[in-house]
Amino acid sequence: MQNSILTLPDPICEPCIASKQTRANIPKSVNSRHSGLLELIHSDLHGPLPVQTRIGAYHYWITFIDDASRYWTVAPLKHKSDAFAAFKAFKALAENQLNARIKVLHDDKGGEYMSKEWEELCTTSGIKRIHTLRAELYQNRVAEYTNRTFKEGITTMLNKASLPSFFWWDAVSTFTHIHNRSLTSIL
């Protein structure tokens, strides 16, 4: 008698598998985490994406991740040069809502983070800057891992819903909303 369990098809989620294919491994590491909100913000810019959004003509997104809560804030950008305006908006909203100040900003030292106006704002606001080496993704692992999680999540969402890729910002917004309302091991 043949075992009926062996004849059942393997439940494989093809959109999940397709979205998790990567080029390089970003190692996970347990480091000490800051305990206060806004004590450390990780940031990274992703893009350009090969297709612009259906509304707004966006090609990039920038992430701001609070180290203590792992709360994600994401903004769409048309150009890399829009990153500073996105940071100013994030800083104003986060500091106002949490009644706290950003103490440290960690980024990958990309050109979008190195403008004179960005440096001046951080200096006058008392924000310490931490830059990683450009080729060492693991040094900015929180932001890099978040972007990787975004790519996997939105690819899965778009594939599962059979939506065209120009809906990527809608998927990023939805994915962020779901993440920020889900329990994490941090909390």
What would you call each of these model-derived segments?
Residues 1-187:
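Anionic group-binding determinants
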